[in-house]
């Protein structure tokens, strides 16, 4: 063990205050961990009892009840709509076709003429022309100009 002289020294003022004992101020203590109220305890107890009752419920105590089906009659609006629908379908099915006039159909989407088709084909052929099939040709320019007089 270390000798007393080797231990760290304490401040003289602090050592004197420790020996004399300082007078401490009176302080009011406050609880940081508040205990639950009677209402909280009763509510938790009730909750635990309900859970226990649900877990240990005897389903044999239940009585079966007969199912009563109610027949709902349609409203006046529903009947009116259905009646209108039936009248319309009846009128369509029993429509007198003798009163209709015969008409000739006129073709409004006329097919293009052969010249228009040929013109369109030449444009397509020019756009997709393959130049690799062409052969190289030297051009010969002639400078001989012959003038003939008209008689």
From Swiss-Prot:
Entry comment describing in which tissues the protein is expressed: At the comma stage, enriched in the developing nerve ring (at protein level). Ubiquitously expressed in larvae and adults with enrichment in the spermatheca, the intestinal tract and the posterior bulb of the pharynx (at protein level). Expressed in oocytes and in the gonad (at protein level).
Subunit annotation: Interacts (via repeats 1, 2 and 4) with G-actin in a 1:3 ratio. Interacts (via repeats 2 and 3) with F-actin.
One GO process term, biological-process aspect: actin filament organization
GO terms for MF: actin monomer binding
Sequence repeats: 24-29, 62-67, 100-105, 134-139
Protein name in UniProt: Thymosin beta
Signal peptide: none
Summary of the function given for this chain in its UniProt record: Plays an important role in the organization of the cytoskeleton by regulating actin polymerization in two ways. Firstly, by binding to and sequestering actin monomers (G actin) inhibits actin polymerization. Secondly, by binding directly filamentous actin (F actin) promotes actin polymerization. Regulates the formation of cortical actin in oocytes conferring them enough rigidity to sustain the contractions during ovulation.
Region (4 X 6 AA repeat of L-[KH]-[KSH]-[VT]-[EP]-[TV]): 24-139
GO CC, one annotated term: anchoring junction
Organism: Caenorhabditis elegans
Keywords for the protein's UniProt record, in alphabetical order: Actin-binding, Cell junction, Cytoplasm, Cytoskeleton, Repeat
Entry similarity comment: Belongs to the thymosin beta family.
Domain of life: Eukaryota
UniProt domain comment: The 4 repeats act cooperatively in the binding of G actin.
Recorded phenotype for the gene knockout or disruption: Lethal at the L3/L4 larval stages or at the young adult stage. Mutants are shorter and stouter, and fail to produce a viable progeny. In oocytes, actin is diffused in the cytoplasm and F-actin accumulation at the cell cortex is reduced resulting in deformed oocytes in the spermatheca and the uterus.
Localization, UniProt: Cytoplasm, Cell cortex; Cytoplasm; Cell junction; Cytoplasm, Cytoskeleton
